[in-house]
Amino acid sequence: AMHGRTRKQMYMGEADWETLKDVADALTIPFVGNGDVTTPEKAKSMLEDVGADAVMVGRAALGNPWIIKDMVHYLDTGEKLRPQTVEEKVATAKEQLNGLIDLKGEKIAVPEFRRQAAYYLKGIPRSARTRAKINDVWTKQEVFDLLDDFVEKYEARQKQINR
């Protein structure tokens, strides 16, 4: 596996897919390409244009665990799946928190989850306040109440918009 960004670049700039292609072309063993694979189309390009035998997804999966299914479906059919609804995103976030609590206990799980929670809400209009408030909660119930309140307000806004 090789990432198309240097250590010095860290998370800045774009992954160098030309270098990945050069390496993939030179190898006789399977090559896994990584870096800026954020959409099903980019996964396809990594396989077809770069010549990777497989694709590794990193930060694009944070708060978006469906991305792998979306990519596989696109590679198999050429069709994109519908995006997840806000309700589906929040339900999955809650499921993740429940799993973390089962694994580590609430006292450790909630602070750990707070770092992930913002990714589930990223890109949703008017979610900034909720993303910020999540950093101030310490219990599962507080997280669930905050997320439920966000969904309720989001749905109310959507109903007003769609009138």
Question: What is the predicted function of each stretch?
Answer:
Residues A1-R163:
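Flavin-dependent oxidoreductase catalytic cores
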